[in-house]
């Protein structure tokens, strides 16, 4: 068996590892938070929602009676717009053209998929999608994060992920094509002890005295 590593194979491996370790437009990961849940995290400014079927690739695949490409959420600076491609309602009004979303808006897709749009932190453009109906994503998640520059986890209601028992806030920050974690205390990233700030990858585990979260790359 020929096990020679050619330059082409090495390049392909390096590119695959880079995609797995650094967030780029169109990439996604699962953010698992111990004691809280799992959140499908999208890094693109334009996110497509549709039915979860193998023949269609969308950013947020939902198990429900939807069109394959049902709607698009797009971030423009600090504002999010929803663009309907299938029957879509915002605050009980059907829309047929892009509409700006406000924090707390209820979105209905099709006959029964109900979501709530949240933009809880006044200093962050990151948004969260909560499920009001029983429908879930594939892979299953407790919510969807549309990550802009930062994602804040902590005990306050204005955090993107609310973790009531945490003493310190944890902030994930995008820096060009990399991710970093900021915590105002000592914490570990993949077993290495840090304080204040540390780089993380799309497969890192971050742990402190009273918190633990991990990232899982999604192809």
PLM region descriptions:
Residues 27, 107, 125-133, 180-183, ...:
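Short, hydrophobic/proline-enriched secondary-structure or compact coil segments at domain edges
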Residues 35-37, 110-112, 208-212:
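Glycine-centered tight beta-turn/hairpin loop motif at sheet-sheet or coil-to-beta transitions
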Residues 102-123:
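Short, structured interface segments
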């Amino acid at each position: 068996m020929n096990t020679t590593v050619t330059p082409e194979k090495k390049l392909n491996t390096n590119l695959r590892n880079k995609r797995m370790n650094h967030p780029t437009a169109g990439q996604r990961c699962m953010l698992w938070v111990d004691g809280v849940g799992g959140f499908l995290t999208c890094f693109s400014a334009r996110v497509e929602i549709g039915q979860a079927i193998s023949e269609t690739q969308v950013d947020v695949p939902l198990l429900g009676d939807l069109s394959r490409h049902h709607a698009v959420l797009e971030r423009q600076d600090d504002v999010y717009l929803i663009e309907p491609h299938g029957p879509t309602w915002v605050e009980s009004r059907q829309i047929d053209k892009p509409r700006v979303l406000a924090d707390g808006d209820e979105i209905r897709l099709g006959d029964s998929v109900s979501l709530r749009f949240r933009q809880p932190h006044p200093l962050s453009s990151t948004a969260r999608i909560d499920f009001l109906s029983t429908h879930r994503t594939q892979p299953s998640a407790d919510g969807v994060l549309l990550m802009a520059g930062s994602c804040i986890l902590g005990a306050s209601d204005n955090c993107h992920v609310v973790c009531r028992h945490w003493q310190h806030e944890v902030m994930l920050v995008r820096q060009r094509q990399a991710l970093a974690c900021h915590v105002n205390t000592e914490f570990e990233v993949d077993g290495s002890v840090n304080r204040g700030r540390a780089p993380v990858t799309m497969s890192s585990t971050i742990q402190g005295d009273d918190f633990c979260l991990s990232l899982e790359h999604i192809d």
